[in-house]
């Protein structure tokens, strides 16, 4: 997570939570003049389009007042979806036993992309079962992580 993404998470989390939703995480994607702030929200009873619209209004109001992003951007608010992104250690703990794709910031054993089942979470260390072996990753070295849906 970048410094800006951490700042935005701190800025938005209380407001989103006060509205009855969980701020799962967010991504800020810089793409020249077409930057996007993608915010993932959830609710204990699931989330629908109306919930996303309500959360979007709440987030927009905070962003308009605080104005933490200096470039033009589009706001997208959505559910985490089937390929749910994992941002926090608690997310990994919630999905122990599930298969995930990881992309690392810095390669480990000459690999940046990993796929395996979450077997343990200890503090900021995430352990996956990869090809029969346990591999442990520091949360701070994980650039992106998504659940792999089972059909």
Curated annotation (Swiss-Prot):
Belongs to the RimP family. Its main location: cytoplasm. GO terms for cellular component: cytosol. Required for maturation of 30S ribosomal subunits. Keywords: Cytoplasm, Ribosome biogenesis. It comes from the Bacteria. It is found in: Cytoplasm. GO terms for biological process: ribosomal small subunit assembly; translation. InterPro entries: Ribosome_maturation_RimP (IPR003728), RimP_C (IPR028998), RimP_C_sf (IPR036847), RimP_N (IPR028989), RimP_N_sf (IPR035956). CDD domains: YlxS_C. Gene3D superfamilies: Ribosome maturation factor RimP, C-terminal domain, RimP-like superfamily, N-terminal. The gene is rimP. This is Ribosome maturation factor RimP.
């Amino acid at each position: 997570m970048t410094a800006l993404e951490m700042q935005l998470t701190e800025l938005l989390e209380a407001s989103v939570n006060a509205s009855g939703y969980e701020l799962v995480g967010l991504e800020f994607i810089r793409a020249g003049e077409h930057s996007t702030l993608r915010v993932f929200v959830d609710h204990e009873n699931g989330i629908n389009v109306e919930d996303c619209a309500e959360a979007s209004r709440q987030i927009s109001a905070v962003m308009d007042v605080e104005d933490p992003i200096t470039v033009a951007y589009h706001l997208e608010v959505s559910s985490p979806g089937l390929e749910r992104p994992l941002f926090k250690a608690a997310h990994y703990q919630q999905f122990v036993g599930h298969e995930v794709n990881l992309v690392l910031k810095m390669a480990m054993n000459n690999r940046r992309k990993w796929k395996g089942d979450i077997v343990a979470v200890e503090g900021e260390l995430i352990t996956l079962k990869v090809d029969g072996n346990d591999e442990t990753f520091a949360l701070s070295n994980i650039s992106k992580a998504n659940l792999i849906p089972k059909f």
